[in-house]
Structures are given as C-alpha cells and as structure tokens.
Amino acid sequence: MKKRILIVSHAMEIGGAESALLGILENIDTEIYQVDLFLMRHEGELLKFIPRNINLLPEIPEYTVLARPIKDVIKERHFLLAVARLYAKYKAKVFDKKKKYTESGVAIEYSHKYTKRFMPTIQPDVQYDMAISFLTPHYFVTEKVQAKQKIAWIHTDYSVVQVDTESELAMWKPYDYIASISEDVTHSFLKTFPSLKKKMILIENILPKTLIEKQAEELVQKKFDTQTTNLLSIGRFATPKNFDNVPDICKRILEKGINVKWYLIGYGGDETLIRKKIDEADDRCM
C-alpha cells in the first residue's frame, strides 16, 4: 500500500518557490507514494506543468478568497472571513506602528492566523502519512489537515524580513520538521528562532527539468535594443526581493553615463509600488 503525502501551497504563479515545488513533484516516486496537491487557487503560469501523476485536489471556496480584495470576499458572502481579514489588517498596522516598521511581513501571517478558525478541513476523510506546508504562513496544515507527520518549508532569508517573532514561533512549533532550502536560510532563521534548531532539516531546491526544457524551446518574441545594455530581473514583487529600489538604481546607472534598460518580470503585492517608482524615476526600467 502506497504512503500518502499531501502538499499544500498557494498557487502556481512564476516564482522560485513554485519552480522548486515543480522540481519536487517531478522527482517524487509515485510508485511508492500517492501524492495529493492542494492549491488554494488554481492560478498561475506554472499550473500547466504539474505532472499528471500528481493528484491536484479541487479548490475550496474559502481558501480561494484569501488573496482577493476584501470587497470580493463580501460579494461572495464569506462575511466571517471578511471580518477576520479586516481585523488582521488592523492588527498588522498596530504591530508595525508599535515596532516602528515601515512595512513588515506580518500582514499575510495575520491574515491566515485570524481566518484559520473559519476554514474547512482539507480532505477531512483522509489521514496522510505526511503533510507538507510549502509556503508560509503555515497555519492551515497544522490545524486543517490530518497527518502522522507534518513538515513546513522555509524559503525566506529572515535577516531581511520583519516579523512578529512571538506569533511566528507559535506557528512553527507544532511541526515535526522544518525544511530549509540552504545553509544561509537555516542560519538566518535560527538567529530569529534558536529554540527550533532540532527541527531543522536541509532540503535544497530541485530544478524542474521538464519546465526548463519546455521553456528553452519557446520562441522569444521580444526584440531587445542591441545598442544598449539590457538587464533582466525575475522574481516575486515583494519587499524581501527589493524590486521597488530597481527604478532608482537604474536611474543612477544612467546618470553615470551607462546606457541601460532594466526589465522586471514577476508578480506580487508590490507591483503598484514598483510602477509608481518607475514613473518617478525613468522609463528605462520597465
């Protein structure tokens, strides 16, 4: 009888963590393990690359609204979730003001923390041998999944993010193991949460071979200006990635007489901020 594994993540938009997840899914031996994948939203450019031998579970409406505007949550009559998210936003603002943080990482953590009580159980009739929470926040796998062992993944360098350490410690503690993608990530994480050292394991990212091969074969339509230096940055538009400073950096490079164009590809909550910074700086960043 096959061991049953559940992996929980957000969506499959372009990003390093999502690509790493594809690498794991490609390399799991499905002759030995039966793998269920629960995505809160069936969205993203990488969704089509999920291997066919992986069982993609149906969406659950309550989970799909977590990343959508609160007005949409109200329209879909998820009133308790809307109230919980409003409360989470309020608590995040209070925390940031108290700590004098300009923009911390607590907003999304609080969003999951205060909505979890209203979320339905994922696969209520199944007890898994192992459940993996692949992206933070990690509340739902601990409280909404039945499994003999539970693992939370960490992709973030904690030396560059501002978090509510007391709240997050309570989030991480219930897990049997915490999988870090690198020694540096482990080091920064343990500086913040030294008491979790015994739970740490190292599992480096696995490149998704199929995805890379398919993308390498695709024709690139964009024609670049050969008379300038073209730079390209790809990633999630979030505070730790520092994309919002790229327009100013690009402007400074131009002021030094270097002919450059800087292209940004990605998605995320900082997109509006980045576009504003581009308008303020120079259209050579796009």
Protein language model features and the residues they cover:
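A structural motif in glycosyltransferase catalytic domains
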Residues: 21-24, 28, 231, 246-249, ...
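Glycosyltransferase donor-sugar binding loop
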Residues: 39-44, 234, 261-273
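Donor nucleotide-sugar binding/catalytic pocket of nucleotide-sugar-dependent glycosyltransferases
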Residues: 151-155, 159, 173-215
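Nucleotide-sugar donor-binding and catalytic loop/hinge architecture
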Residues: 1-3, 214-230, 254-256
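Conserved donor-binding/catalytic core segment of Leloir-type glycosyltransferases
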Residues: 6, 223-241, 247-250
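Short donor-sugar binding/catalytic loops of nucleotide-sugar-dependent glycosyltransferases
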Residues: 11-12, 234-238, 253, 268
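N-terminal strand-loop element at the rim of the active site
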Residues: 13-14, 32-103, 200
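Nucleotide-activated donor-binding/catalytic signature segment of Leloir-type glycosyltransferases, i.e.
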Residues: 55-57, 272-286
